[in-house]
Regions:
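Hydrophobic h-region of N-terminal signal peptides that target proteins for export
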Residues: 10-18
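Cell-envelope and extracellular/periplasmic
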Residues: 20-472
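Positively charged n-region of N-terminal signal peptides that target proteins for export
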Residues: 1-4
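Sec-dependent N-terminal signal peptides
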Residues: 6-8
Length: 472
């Protein structure tokens, strides 16, 4: 009896620590819920039951187990109607107000996804003044919650934060890439868009992966994570635990990812890492059939201490390779957005809009031509008469600029030494002829295959050309 009494007392103390009914910061005023889905609300309470009552439907009552509860709430079709949800137990209640039903996306990565609209460290975001000035127009169309930087040894459930409504003040602090992505989506779909932003500048992909996957790839996760010389943002699984686990399973349409600059030295394994990361994330969201699209962004060209180096384009190759490994994925081309001296290009609107174009066609049935959505890809190269004749994909309507030298090409002969070359577009064809007086008999051609080199080749709908090498 004494043991039973002691056990009951300890259990009572544990439950009393929870106190009144509570929900994580993810479930708060101004939030957006994914339309036509089941959103799993969760929280704590010291009572037997909790009721979740949405303004659009019947209340759902669930049992509390060990102080915790979960309730699946079905959401209606998207609209601009303002909703509320009441979460209550026998003694207390939480009101979640100004709630919208729309489209939700999880946006993650390193600094080019994290970079706020206001810019950072003397590096601006193009058009930020105009974008922020007009932000209040989208108060009922866009909402964003940004998770604070946090690393953790184990998966976390909660974080400090709140859903923000766009205004000239709040928009400046929002992820510029994610905001422009949301802006393009809400304009095209005429629906509310919610963004869950979870990024950390300078982070390596290993920090976002599962420990099991990393160990299978040969990582000694315990040694790496106990090494004080390795920053947490580069240690194994630390950022998944701190930034993704707290929103794990939150109903969303898909993912947008902008990362890779911190993995230039391990480009040979990056495609497999991407494949494993995406599979793990989808599994944690209960998506075993790859229904949630994974959209990701080519790292931007940047000199990286050596403009002539090839570390960046090799990582870009791995990003392209990952497309073949990852079902329902898409890659945004950024060859034309890079800046030689800044790793954070200002053209965040371009990146956000290109992400949106992929989402619109892939998720929402918007009929956009391939040339408007996909970056231009190398198809083949033929060598004859002292020149390379290069044919491209995703350029059905031709290439531009016509009649001007095309920058960014290089040719090599049998010696394997590459020299700058000039390209000329073959009129009305997705073909460029490339020649160089320094290479009378070329056997290999490259385009934009340096950490940074000026380029100017696009298709007629403005999509840039992915870096490539014919001698891979």
């Amino acid at each position: 009896m004494k043991r039973l009494f002691l056990l009951s007392a300890l259990l009572g103390l544990a439950l009393s620590a929870f106190g009144k009914v509570e929900v994580p910061a993810l479930f708060s005023d101004h939030m957006v819920l994914q339309q036509r889905s089941t959103v799993e609300f969760r929280g704590t309470s010291d009572k037997r039951e909790v009721t979740v009552a949405p303004s659009w439907g019947d209340p759902v009552t669930v049992r509390v187990r060990n102080g915790r509860w979960r309730a699946g709430i079905a959401t209606p079709e998207a609209s601009f109607a303002k909703h509320r949800i009441t979460v209550s137990d026998a003694d207390s209640a939480v009101e979640i107000e100004d709630l919208l039903i729309g489209e939700v996306w999880i946006c993650s990565g390193q600094s080019n996804m994290y970079m706020p609209l206001r810019g950072s460290s003397g590096q601006p975001v193009a058009g930020s003044f105009e974008t922020a000035l007009e932000a209040s127009r989208y108060a009922d169309r866009i909402r964003m919650i940004t998770l604070p930087k946090r690393e953790a040894d184990t998966p976390q459930e909660e974080f400090e934060g709140r859903w923000e409504v766009p205004s000239p003040q709040t928009a400046l602090l929002m992820s510029a890439t994610a905001y422009h992505f949301a802006l393009a989506l809400t304009e095209a779909l005429d629906l509310p868009v919610g963004i869950v932003s979870a990024s950390w500048g300078g982070s390596a992909i290993e920090a976002w992966m599962s420990p099991d996957d990393l160990r299978e790839m040969g990582y000694d996760t315990e040694t790496i994570n106990s090494d004080p010389k390795i920053e947490p943002r580069r240690q194994c699984s630390k950022l998944y635990n701190g930034l993704i686990a707290p929103v794990e399973g939150f109903a969303a349409r898909g993912f947008a990812w902008y990362q890779g600059e911190s993995n230039l030295r391990t480009a040979d394994r990056y495609a497999e890492q991407m494949e494993r990361l995406v599979r793990f994330w989808r599994t944690q969201w209960g998506d075993t059939k790859s229904r949630m699209p994974f959209l990701y962004v080519q790292i931007a060209p940047y000199e990286n201490k050596d403009a002539a180096g090839t570390e960046a384009p090799r990582l870009m190759e791995a990003q392209i390779d990952a497309l073949e490994r990852i079902p329902n994925s898409a890659l945004v081309c950024t060859t034309d957005t890079g800046e030689k001296s800044y790793i954070h290009p200002a053209a965040k609107r371009t990146v956000g809009q290109r992400l949106a174009a992929q989402a619109l066609r892939r998720c929402y049935g918007v009929k956009l031509p391939n040339e408007m959505v996909e970056g231009v890809r190398f198809e083949k190269a033929e060598f004859a008469d002292g020149k390379a004749v290069v044919t491209f994909l995703n350029a059905r309507y031709g290439l531009t600029p016509q009649g001007e030298p095309i920058l960014g090409f290089e040719l090599a002969g049998a010696d394997g030494v590459f020299h700058p070359a000039e390209g000329r577009i073959v009129k009305s064809k997705p073909v460029v002829e490339v020649a160089s007086p320094a290479v009378p008999q070329p056997v290999a051609v490259r385009y934009a295959f340096r950490n940074f080199t000026p380029t100017n080749l696009h298709n007629t709908l403005g999509q840039a050309v992915f870096p490539f090498r014919s001698d891979r």
